[in-house]
């Protein structure tokens, strides 16, 4: 979520949602699109992950910025001057309640800012979506449809919503602990026990979503954030821009082609109706990366990548796989199953012997060196510059960028070849 050209948008389900979040009615005052010049003035802040439900502290937002006078002194830091400019461009109801601190992410029709509640001084993230654009409106509707229903420790929480005729402001929790793999690289130690603890939190969140009839459809490491920098931080699932929400008892089959290539399930590639088992396939890919620092399916050529996924062919060769338990490999195998009906559900995955036994284990082999080396090696091979490749922050390159999102035309061609091969 966050970029109109990066994903195929989901179909809006026809169901009745339970609104648990405060909604502020549209502002009736005079409107002017003062935001249209905003992008060019805040150009030094990098984009925020694949979507913007939560913000990592890694975006380096500026510290609490005091109010600036109308005339900026020549020595005023550029970042502070920019903050002063875009702070005034938010709806007055938002700025009356929240102090805008820094821009921490942006997409083609959305911006995310770090804010502080004026009364409590509690930090939050506000996502502003331009709903005057069709893509922004559809993504906003999809995300709100989910976030207004969910209350779970491992899912990003929506606090309140402000609406105008052309924009929606979503106030959310602010995740400051960083991305999953950044934490692994920085930690210095990572065992199968650590992996199962991460997966337990993610699986519990996914189990909750599936019980509500919600399918995420874009689970990947960059959408899994640590809530705070502490060692006891929980993992939260973010980015529900492609999620599908069906009321209980409704038709559970989905047809929209969407997702990120390396994590997309085979049944989506061949454009068959699918269920929430696509989330479990993605979790299998995540588990594989979590234990090795490498991808089970990877190729710069999309067609070859999709063929690998359709065959379900991957291997456990290279480090650190010889040191990984057979139970862990069995866990992955039961998720990376081409037949969606044979895949484990979230509840079954939580009850898998590996998750149950390793989570209670007191000592396991440290896999950190191999995992971090593999993550950084892959990052280096995909970075545009040597400098970024050598940086620890370059581990963010393990994510799939906009140019590697699923394209409908490619899947139509792939599906045609699939039908010719297997049906004719």
Curated annotation (Swiss-Prot):
SMART domains in the cross-refs: S_TKc
GO annotation terms (biological process): determination of left/right symmetry; heart development
Record carries keyword Glycoprotein: no
Cell location: Golgi apparatus; Cytoplasm, Cytoskeleton, Microtubule organizing center, Centrosome; Nucleus speckle; Endoplasmic reticulum membrane
GO cellular component: centrosome; cilium; cytoplasm; cytosol; endoplasmic reticulum membrane; Golgi apparatus; nuclear speck; plasma membrane
Top-level taxon of origin: Eukaryota
Biased composition (Polar residues): 57-72
Residues linked to a lipid group, S-palmitoyl cysteine type: 3
Binding-site positions, ATP: 104-112, 127
Mod. after translation: Autophosphorylated on serine residues. Myristoylated. Required for membrane association. Prerequisite for palmitoylation to occur.
Catalytic activity: L-seryl-[protein] + ATP = O-phospho-L-seryl-[protein] + ADP + H(+); L-threonyl-[protein] + ATP = O-phospho-L-threonyl-[protein] + ADP + H(+)
Entry GO MF terms: ATP binding; protein serine kinase activity; protein serine/threonine kinase activity
Lipidation (N-myristoyl glycine): 2
InterPro entries per the UniProt record, alphabetical: Kinase-like_dom_sf (IPR011009), Prot_kinase_dom (IPR000719), Protein_kinase_ATP_BS (IPR017441), Ser/Thr_kinase_AS (IPR008271)
Region of interest: Disordered: 49-81, 378-407
Active site residues of this protein: 218
Keywords: ATP-binding, Cell membrane, Cytoplasm, Cytoskeleton, Endoplasmic reticulum, Golgi apparatus, Kinase, Lipoprotein, Membrane, Myristate, Nucleotide-binding, Nucleus, Palmitate, Phosphoprotein, Serine/threonine-protein kinase, Transferase
Family indicated by similarity: Belongs to the protein kinase superfamily. CAMK Ser/Thr protein kinase family.
Its job: May be a SFC-associated serine kinase (splicing factor compartment-associated serine kinase) with a role in intranuclear SR protein (non-snRNP splicing factors containing a serine/arginine-rich domain) trafficking and pre-mRNA processing.
Record text on subunit structure and interactions: Homodimer.
Protein name as annotated: Serine/threonine-protein kinase H1
Species: Bos taurus
